[in-house]
Amino acid sequence: MQTVIVGVGVDVVDVARLAAALERTPSLRQRLYTAAEQEITRIESLAARFAAKEACAKVLGAPGLPWTDAEVVNEDSGRPRLVVTGSAAQAADALGITTWHLSLSHDGGVATAVVIGEKP
């Protein structure tokens, strides 16, 4: 079965800038990350997850979505997977998106994410 790419989102996050923002505004962690994501201690991993949320918003073309409506979870293999809930899931449904692809990376003080949304 052929699928159609609905959108591609790419984002880059400066790790030090995110670290400073989280230190300056402790409540920001709760606004940006789900309870499971808040357990992560490596700032590079948090930055990559924030990049994924931004990239997901770009795919959906829906500004103002709650950050916690897009979550990065790890499969048993360690591979990251994007899970959308709430208004992000509603926006994805409206676009017909049924499959997400996610790639995360961090090096040299930056974190990147690429998100692809597909429909049948």
Per-region residue spans from a language model:
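Core catalytic alpha/beta fold that binds nucleotide/phospho-ligands
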Residues: 1-120
